[in-house]
Curated annotation (Swiss-Prot):
Annotated organism of origin: Rhodococcus jostii (strain RHA1)
Active site, UniProt feature: D111 (proton acceptor)
Protein encoded by which gene: coaX
Name this protein carries in UniProt: Type III pantothenate kinase
Domain of life: Bacteria
Catalytic activity: (R)-pantothenate + ATP = (R)-4'-phosphopantothenate + ADP + H(+)
Subunit note: Homodimer.
PANTHER family, A to Z: TYPE III PANTOTHENATE KINASE
Length: 271
């Protein structure tokens, strides 16, 4: 079984895959809050508790972290507790098969890279990936699977929390779809601005990408939503085509299998 670990600023998601290649299947996933202070031992304790009987069935691990302190602890955890298991940490220098056609490839987040890889693998077409996480990332992937760049905006929670904390008369509200775009009270007005406002932000960015890049003006372009808040925002958009909740986990699986295949190819002449 392959364990995939997706560490973001807000949540950590674990995914467990059986099989490989076309026969791979995500059989279970877990979600927990990210704590940048967690140690390798604490991470191992939590992971083992969630995995239960599957702990001893892990044959590989593929992980990414957008939180540097947690990435360091995951590296220690893998060495200490799963040292006998092949693992891949997606970071600069790791081969993903995604050409990064940007000014500074080392600045591109691992989450954006694996999302691009998974999108190209699933659809084999020009793709625009919208990841609704701590930040809202719009990533542009060519028909060849190249990462062309994109846009980063504040996430839904960050924007809502900032509005409440910086405004004396406003308070934090539950982020749900209001009954109308025209709010009848302060709570509904804030919910309308958040939900419909972010839907408009996404639609605006997607339309600008399609207008600016000739290769993205056709009907073959696929716009994919992923991330924690995708189920809330996607239904209000006009440009998003598909929802792939496990896109990052799928990308981590693909990176692991590509690196394992490469290692096998390097070993084969000596066998």
């Amino acid at each position: 079984m392959l364990l995939t670990v997706d560490v973001r600023n807000t949540n950590i998601v674990l995914g467990l895959f059986t099989g490989s290649g076309e026969h791979s299947k995500l059989v279970q996933d877990w979600r927990m809050r990210t704590d940048a202070r967690m140690t390798a031992d604490e991470l191992a304790l939590i992971f083992r508790g969630l995995l239960g009987a599957h702990t001893d069935q892990i044959t590989g691990v593929s992980a990414l972290s957008t939180v540097p302190s947690v990435l360091r602890e995951i590296r220690v955890m893998l060495t200490r507790y799963w040292g006998h298991v092949p693992h891949v940490l997606v970071e600069p220098g790791v081969r993903t098969g995604v050409p990064l056609l940007v000014d500074n490839p080392k600045e591109v987040g691992a989450d954006r890279i694996v999302n691009s890889l998974a999108a190209h693998h699933l659809y084999d077409a020009p793709c625009i990936v919208v990841d609704f996480g701590t930040s809202t990332c719009v990533d542009v992937v060519s028909a060849k699977g190249e990462f062309l760049g994109g846009a980063i905006a504040p996430g839904l929670e960050i924007s809502s929390d900032a509005l409440a904390s910086q405004s004396a008369a406003l308070r934090k509200v539950e982020l749900v779809r209001p009954r109308s775009v025209v709010g009848k009270n302060t709570v509904e007005c804030m919910q309308s601005g958040a939900v419909f406002g972010f839907a408009g932000l996404v639609d605006g960015l997607v339309r600008r990408v399609r207008k600016e890049l000739p290769a993205f003006s056709g009907s073959d372009v696929v716009v994919i939503a992923t991330g924690d808040r995708a189920p809330l925002i996607m239904p209000e958009t006009e440009t998003v085509d598909e929802h792939e909740p496990d896109l990052t986990l799928e990308g981590l699986r693909l990176v692991y299998e590509r690196n394992q295949a490469r290692r096998g190819a390097r070993r084969s002449p000596l066998e």
